[in-house]
């Protein structure tokens, strides 16, 4: 029996869940963020989201048609990628640039590596990083959700010199600048509750990631307020709930998930606290995506009754 594709010890639990049903649950969980972005940033947020989804589905369909492969549109994974990438860009992101990110996510990161389940990193994550590196000006042009300063560039909470002056309520409700999906913590929490309630994801990764970040900032700043600001600011919550929990690029054991989450917290904290870049979530996720195979190997469950083979004696003895 070929065991190359067996990544966990038996017994293997089977269920009636399909890729389509899991992706559908993720889409439902993303709806609060999509609705919140439309309320906070207006009609263009809907346009950005719609274009991103259509582009991802179209690129996947075109790629499969050209290579005469079965179009996997029914699994809804391209829709999820399109929504997540849209939630990772500012409302003013030029449509042409956004479509480039969709192309990278679907064709290069997902399909060229063999399709769903074969990608080395989260497609939407890599698409966001490519957009950030290639179009830094567009990705760093924040719009503050206030009619009086509509379409004006505004600093995000992470760039504020004195975090103690920031309102936790404003951060929780999304009354601050940022990308579409990260601003409203309430919407993200609602999505998390749905995903956990439907057993689509485990709470282990979001809890260990966000919890470790809170502890690290509490130790570093000696301030509960500043630690909460760090948790509610930037892409931490959105990344922890919708990107770090990606099935393909996250560990499969509970121990592995906890190790992964804490490691994400360490890397993100290091980038934010000591680095020159105020965010850090995207690069932390990409870095840790590469370590997932090793985490899986180190935390692999030992089969019941397994006996480690004795080392062979040296020849001649």
Predicted features, each with a name:
Residues 120, 124, 206, 228-236, ...:
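Loop-to-transmembrane alpha-helix initiation sites
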Residues 1-22, 271-317:
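Cytosolic-side transmembrane-helix boundaries in multi-pass membrane proteins
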């Amino acid at each position: 029996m070929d065991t190359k594709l067996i990544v966990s010890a038996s017994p293997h639990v089977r269920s009636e869940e399909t890729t389509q049903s899991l992706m559908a649950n993720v889409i439902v969980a993303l709806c609060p963020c999509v609705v919140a972005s439309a309320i906070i940033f207006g009609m263009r947020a809907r346009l950005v989201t719609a274009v991103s989804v259509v582009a991802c589905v179209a690129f996947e369909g075109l790629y499969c048609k050209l290579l005469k492969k079965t179009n996997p549109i029914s699994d809804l994974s391209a829709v999820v990628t399109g929504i997540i990438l849209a939630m990772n860009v500012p409302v003013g992101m030029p449509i042409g640039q956004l479509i480039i990110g969709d192309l990278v996510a679907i064709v290069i990161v997902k399909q060229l590596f063999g399709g769903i389940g074969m990608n080395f990193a989260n497609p939407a994550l890599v698409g966001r990083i490519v957009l950030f590196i290639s179009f830094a000006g567009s990705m760093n042009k924040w719009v503050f959700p206030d009619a009086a300063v509509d379409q004006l560039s505004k600093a995000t909470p992470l760039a504020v010199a004195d975090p103690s002056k920031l309102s936790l309520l404003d951060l929780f409700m999304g009354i601050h600048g940022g990308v579409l999906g990260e601003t409203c913590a309430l919407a993200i929490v609602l999505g998390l509750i749905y995903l956990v309630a439907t057993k689509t994801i485990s709470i282990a990764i979001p809890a260990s990631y966000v919890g470790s970040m809170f502890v690290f900032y509490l130790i570093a700043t000696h301030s509960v307020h500043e630690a909460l600001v760090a948790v509610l600011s930037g892409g931490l919550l959105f990344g922890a709930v919708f990107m770090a929990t990606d099935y393909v690029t996250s560990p499969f054991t509970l121990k592995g998930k906890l190790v992964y989450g804490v490691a994400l917290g360490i890397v993100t904290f290091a980038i934010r606290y000591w680095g020159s870049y105020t965010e850090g979530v995207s690069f932390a996720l990409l870095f840790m995506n590469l370590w997932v195979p090793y985490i899986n190997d180190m935390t692999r469950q030992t089969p019941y009754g397994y006996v480690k083979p004795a080392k062979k004696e040296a020849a001649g003895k």
